[in-house]
Amino acid sequence: MNHIQILEYENECQLANEVTYHPVYRIAQLWTFVVSILAIPALYIFLMKRILPLPFHGNIKFLLVCYFSASFVFAVLLAFLFSYHVVAPLFITSMCDLIIRPSLYKVGNLSLTLFMTIQMIMPLGFSIERFIALSMTKSYENVRTFLGPLLVFTLIGIDLALLYHVFRDEKFEDSFISFALVPETSAIPFNSYFWELLYAEIGNFICNCIFLLVHSKFKARFLHQQRSLSVRYLLEEISQTSKFTLIVSFTHLLFVGWYLIATIFVRTIGEDFFGGYIHYTVARGVHITVPTYNLTIVFVGIKALSFMNLRRQNNVQSKVQIRSTGAEGARNYEDAIANYWNFVSRT
C-alpha cells in the first residue's frame, strides 16, 4: 500500500468518525432505531387484529396483508441494521471499525432498498384491483382470490427487475458508514427510479380520487336498477376498501414524497451550502421520514377503520329499520304475528 493509499484510508476512517459522532447524525440514528422498535409490535398487532379480520374480498385483503407484512419486515430490518449504527460506536477500538464491511453493507442496503420500494409499488395493485372489482360488480363476490396474489407477485417481480437494472454494475467497493446511503456510483439511476415510483404514486392517488367519484355516481345509478342485498353490500364494500386504500396511499405519499424531495434537495445544493463535506454527508445520512411512516400508518389505519365502522353502523341504524306505525307498520305487525304462529304450529 503506497503513501497515497494510506492517506486515503486514514481520511475515510476520519470521515466515518466525524460523521458517526456528529450530534444531528447520532440523534437521527437513535430516532430511526427507537421508532422502528416501536413499529414492530404496532404493525404486528395492527396486521393480526385489524387487517386479517377485515370482511373485504379476498383479493384486496391479500394485497393489504402483503403490504403491511412488507412494512413489518421493513421495520424489523431497520431496527436490526440501525441497532448496529447505535450500538457499534460504543464498543469500537479504532476509527476504522466504523466503516461497514462491504459484504454486510451489500446485504443490508439491498434489503432496505427492496422493502422500501415494495411499499411504494404495492399501492398500484390496490387501484388495479378496485377498478376490476367495480367493472365486475354483479359477479365479483363469486370471484376466487387469484387477482390479489397475481398482482403481488407481478409488482414485486417488476420491482426486483428494476432494482437489478439499477445495481447490476455496482461493485460495492467503497467505504460505507450507513446502510441507508446508496453508493455514489448507483445514486443517479436509483434516484431516477425513485422519482418514477413517486410519479406512479401521485398518479395512483389521482386515479383513486377519480375512482371514488365514478363509484359514487355509478353506485347511485346502479342501485336504481339492481336492488339485491348482495349487490348493495358489494358496492358498499368497494367504497369502504377504496377509501381505506386511498388513506394509506396518501399517507405514504406524504412521507416518501418529503423524503425524496429532501434527498434531491440536499444533493442539488451540494456540500458548499452545508459548509463542508462532513455536514453534507450528515444531511445525506439522515433517514427518519420513512421509518416514522411505519409507526404513523398504524395509528392512521386504526383511526380510519374505526371511523368507517362507526359511519357504517350509523347508516345501518338510520336506514335499515322496520316501521311500526301507519299502514306499513300494521302490515309488519301482522307479518310478525303470522310468522310466529307458523313457527309454533310447525313445532
UniProtKB/Swiss-Prot annotation:
Localization of this protein: Membrane
Record-linked InterPro entries:
7TM_GPCR_serpentine_rcpt_Srb (IPR002184)
Q: Tell me, which GO biological process terms does this entry list?
A: sensory perception of chemical stimulus
Where does the secretion signal sit in this chain? none
**Keywords for the protein's UniProt record, in alphabetical order:** Membrane, Transmembrane, Transmembrane helix
Q: Where are the transmembrane segments?
A: 27-47, 62-82, 108-128, 146-166, 194-214, 246-266, 288-308
Output the Gene Ontology terms for molecular function.
transmembrane signaling receptor activity
Q: Name one GO cellular component term.
A: membrane
Q: Does the keyword Transmembrane helix apply?
A: yes
Q: How does it sit in the membrane?
A: Multi-pass membrane protein
Where this protein primarily resides, as one coarse class? membrane
- UniProt family annotation: Belongs to the nematode receptor-like protein srb family.
Specify the protein name: Serpentine receptor class beta-2
- Species of provenance: Caenorhabditis elegans
